[in-house]
């Protein structure tokens, strides 16, 4: 059985983005830098080998979107600009218009294009209806999430048994740089996973 583990360098670990690797894919995947720390090892080895980029500054953004314009990239790929739509307050009233729901993310506070007497945040993005939902800070708090697109990268009979027996205690995160959050993983009759956190979490977003 092939397993996906976290890299030695926690600041550069990519396992969060590789969750969907199946056994078939893992069997053909090699991570040559997994056991190395970038600053202590990788840069030193690169310098010793005469690599010209050994001390090159790092890029923190997606490499194929160097200008950081994610919305523009998606629009170009789709071949048309994002459609405008309604910005909706927590009571259902329309409080503004947006120029593309893809430009908003849950928890966002700045650049909303809506002026109100108190701080407001994006609490939901409804792509199907092309609406952006706003609310207050308290509306961003949740204690659980459901997972539709989940995968066991390494099937484990013991974990399956624990899951069916009442749940598995896990350390989970829903954001790349986030520290592990204590939670319990359970599965309902339809096979959908439910992750219940020990402590309330802020701005849980799909994806």
Regions found by a protein language model. Name each.
Residues 1-206:
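Nucleotide-activated chemistry modules centered on ATP-dependent adenylation/adenylyltransferase
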